[in-house]
Regions:
Chain A
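N-terminal edge beta-strand
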Residues: 31-52, 154
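Extracellular/periplasmic metallocenter environments
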Residues: 87-130
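C-terminal motif of bacterial Sec signal peptides marking the signal peptidase cleavage site
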Residues: 18-22
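Bacterial N-terminal signal peptides that target proteins for export
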Residues: 1-10
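Beta-strand cores of secreted/periplasmic/IMS beta-sandwich domains, seen most often
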Residues: 47-66, 92-108
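Beta-strand signatures of extracellular beta-sandwich domains
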Residues: 69-73
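Bacterial signal peptide processing site
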Residues: 24-27
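Mature extracytoplasmic or organellar-lumen-exposed domains after removal of signal/transit peptides
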Residues: 126-376
Length: 376, 411
């Protein structure tokens, strides 16, 4: 079934237990060590009130006659987490990442937000659950980012040399390859808000007052393809290199977490493809969009490959869907290969673009679920 | 029809037991919301039972709005397709009951996108119906039997022939699977298609879709026929949702029709009919009325006083629309019409991009739509319309408890 969380499986089971026998829950996540919570129309019994911080599974059973709602409330009364629609006679596993503190566990029969509650105390610190594989994935990913950024800097140097020599043909040839490393790790670069606009802004995205400060790859792209000359543009090349070096100097102090930076970054890379590359907006003059497209996909694939052992264990169906999704996009891209690169995107017709867009959507949807699978 | 005629009571009875099944199944979640919507929002907010012998959205009182979508299946993996159809069925059962998809739109895991997209939160079920159909290309595409169902293609699911005047756009025609979403609230209909499309990513891709803003047909006996964008009531002699005898004879496929898995199902023909609004509006009232064979104000047939007075075809012009489309001119052929008006802005030449999204259900398109449409070759109305999109789909019987959309085909 669709790679929904164990929670969703439990929810569906309550709705249509017998509607679809094939989709009963392969619900194994919360079974071990779950805290039992028994709700009736006027009571809320919790099996354990001294809890340890971190990922905690509550097994909430509704023995009342009304649809119930389970809430974890912070001391200020705000909701930390809630699970709605727990039908009479059903039971759901609900996973919450608990920080240290005191909380109210509330059962609301009729889902009014009010009802009996129990106080619980949580001690310790919530972390990544100590999964060494994730720590290693994050370390490996950081090493990958460093290598890819070095690659972009090396190739950009050659590109800038050609720009400075006003060798238009050579610069055009080196333009797209110089961007590949960057496009592969773009979400990491975007963590430093100031670098991305300097090196990768498109003219169409600028405010009128920003146009005088425009710099980066796309300025040179326009000069090369539209004006046919980069005479006097050498300073922009130097600045591009300096900005990339600044990014490099910041990497040592950077920590990347598996959920937001890696899984979230993979999703962002596919978003980049879906909104910028498939439409041909990114490389409006050079039409080298497919080179960026491939680099974005490669960047997402690298992240997935690093996280895959964990994903396979926590959501095998998601891993299968992602394997299939990546394979399909890669196969489609192959159709448009030309020499070391890709055909000009303005020669890719509407039907082929639709096919690419469909494949990107097909990959982007399961990819958006990667973070939850890793965080589980 | 050889099987026992269902009769009024059977459909009624099953309709009600279907309702109780849904209520039973929904008891776990959101039932209170359905009941709430029912009491507070009146008829337009009600939920239409999802389970039953026939799919809802065919012999269901016509809702105000439409979102129709045709999908291409992008995988060759039968298991994956079946898995999606099961997921769709779950989602459809939830949405038609006024509940969100999966784990809902809010309150889930913070780092995950919500299962439901959320724009229908707080809206009543709005009589949402979701009706699925399978196009000829699902059974065989480019000579390939992708899902091992080629042999199960119903004889009645023919490729529609070219009709004179057709100007069909491939990007607005065909599709392996179609879903008709009808609701009294357009946001509810759009939400339904959007969420199905999202669940389907990787298995299906939207090929084309169409919004309809106003119904042009009624299946409710005695109700006035809503006007189309030409200002006329057309299709007065529709099949009523209460007329089980006519439904059994002209709408529901039977066991002996050549395709067992379609028994209780129906065939949908969808046509995007562009109307040349501006030239029509310059046409004299007399000519407009002659073209339809009805008067514009009341909708009465030529020579009669009331919309539902029996038409005397011989009194109409030989090329009048009603005369050519009438069952008496087509060997008794009848179809259940469920079309909607659309306006997709303007066409770049300052003209309304508007028309009728025609939908008809029938027991067999060969003796239904194709028969009638062939008669319309000489229709005087053709000067003002053009068929630009087309699809034909086999809509399987309704989902029973424990089943899923298409289970009789993929079993």
């Amino acid at each position: 079934m669709r790679p929904v969380s164990a929670l969703a499986v439990a929810g569906v089971a309550a709705v249509s237990m017998s509607l679809l026998t094939a989709c009963g829950g392969d619900d194994d996540a919360g079974a071990a060590g779950a805290i039992p919570v028994t709700a009736t129309d006027d009571s809320c019994e919790v099996g354990k009130t001294e809890l340890t911080a971190g990922k905690t599974t509550f097994k909430v059973t509704n023995k009342g006659s009304k649809v119930n709602e389970f809430e974890v409330l912070k001391p200020d009364g705000k909701i930390l987490a809630e699970r709605e629609n727990i039908g009479p006679g059903t039971s759901v596993d609900f996973v919450v990442n608990l920080p240290a503190g005191t909380f109210k566990l509330l059962c609301s029969a009729g889902q009014t937000g009010k009802g009996p509650s129990k106080d619980v105390t949580v001690t310790g610190t919530a972390g990544e659950g100590g999964d060494q594989r994730l720590a290693k994935a994050a370390a490996d990913y950081k090493a990958f980012v460093v290598v890819r950024l070095d690659d972009t800097i090396t190739k950009t140097k050659a590109f800038v040399d050609a720009v400075k020599a006003n060798d238009v043909a050579k610069a055009k040839e080196l333009y797209a390859p110089s961007r590949v490393g960057w496009e592969t790790i773009e979400p990491v670069a975007e963590k430093f808000g100031d670098i991305d606009p300097k090196v990768d802004a498109r003219e169409a995205d600028l405010k009128p007052e920003e146009k005088k400060d425009w710099s980066g790859w796309h300025l040179l792209e326009k000069a090369l393809w539209k004006d046919g000359s980069v005479k006097g543009k050498g300073k922009y090349g130097d600045q591009l290199l300096a900005d990339l070096e600044t990014l490099k100097s910041r990497l040592p102090g950077l920590t990347l977490d598996p959920v937001n930076d890696m899984a979230g970054g993979a999703k962002e890379l596919l978003d980049e493809v879906a909104t910028g590359k498939v439409t041909g907006e990114e490389e409006a003059f050079s039409h080298t969009d497919l080179v960026d497209f491939k680099a974005n996909v490669d960047g997402a694939k690298k992240i997935y490959d690093l996280l895959k052992p964990v994903v396979q264990e926590r959501d095998a169906q998601l891993a299968t869907d992602l394997d299939g999704g990546f394979a399909k996009v890669e196969a489609l891209l192959k159709k448009h290969e030309k020499g070391d690169g890709y055909v000009s995107y303005d020669t890719v017709g509407k039907d082929d673009r639709k096919e690419l867009a469909d494949a990107v959507n097909a990959l982007g949807e399961p990819l958006s679920k990667l973070a939850a699978a890793v965080a589980r | 029809m050889t099987e026992a005629r269902p009769g009024l009571s059977r459909r009624r009875m099953l309709g009600f037991s279907g309702a109780s099944l849904v209520v039973g199944a929904a008891a776990g979640a959101g039932l209170d919301r359905v009941a709430f919507a029912d009491e507070d929002k009146g008829g337009a907010g009600r939920a239409v039972p999802f389970l039953g012998p026939h799919q809802a959205g065919i012999a269901t009182p016509v809702q105000d709005r439409l979102h129709f979508a045709a999908f291409d299946v992008t995988t060759g993996d039968r298991e994956r397709l079946v898995r999606m159809l099961k997921e769709w069925t779950q989602a459809a059962a939830a949405m038609t009951a006024g509940r969100p998809v999966g784990d809902g739109a809010v309150g889930g895991v913070a780092v995950a996108p919500p299962d439901d997209t959320g724009e229908a939160l707080g809206l009543p079920p709005s009589r949402l119906t979701l009706t699925i159909g399978f196009g000829p290309s699902l059974f065989e595409k480019d000579g390939e039997d992708r899902f091992g169902i080629k042999a199960r293609r119903p004889p009645a699911l023919v490729d529609l022939p070219h009709f004179p005047g057709d100007a069909l756009e491939p990007a607005r025609s065909g599709g392996d699977i179609a879903v008709q979403a009808c609701a009294d609230d357009p946001q509810v209909a759009v939400h339904a298609i959007r969420n199905l499309a999202r669940i389907g990513f990787g298995v299906v891709a939207v090929r084309w879709s169409q919004l309809g803003f106003g119904k042009t047909s009624s299946t409710t006996p005695g109700a006035q026929t809503p006007r189309n964008l030409f200002g006329f009531k057309d299709g007065t002699e529709n099949i009523a949702e209460t007329d089980d005898e006519l439904l059994g004879r002209h709408v529901w496929a039977g066991k002996g029709d050549g395709s067992d898995w379609m028994a209780g199902g129906s065939y949908m023909v969808a046509r995007r009919i562009r109307m040349h609004i501006e030239t029509w509006d310059r046409t004299s009232l007399r000519e407009q009325e002659d073209i339809f064979g009805r008067d514009k104000g009341e909708g009465a047939p030529v020579g009669a006083r009331k919309e539902r007075d029996a038409p005397v075809l011989a009194k109409m012009k030989p090329d009048a629309h009603v005369r050519l489309a009438h069952p008496d001119s087509n060997g008794g052929a009848r179809i259940l019409r469920r079309g909607y008006s659309f306006t997709d802005g303007s066409d770049g030449l300052g003209r309304l991009e508007a028309g009728l999204f025609f939908i008809a259900f029938q027991r067999d398109p060969r003796t239904g739509f194709i028969r009638v449409q062939s008669s319309l070759a000489t229709d005087a109305l053709n000067e003002y319309i053009q068929h630009v999109g087309s699809g034909v789909f086999a809509c399987p019987p309704g989902v029973q408890k424990g089943g899923f959309w298409g289970d009789t085909l993929f079993a």
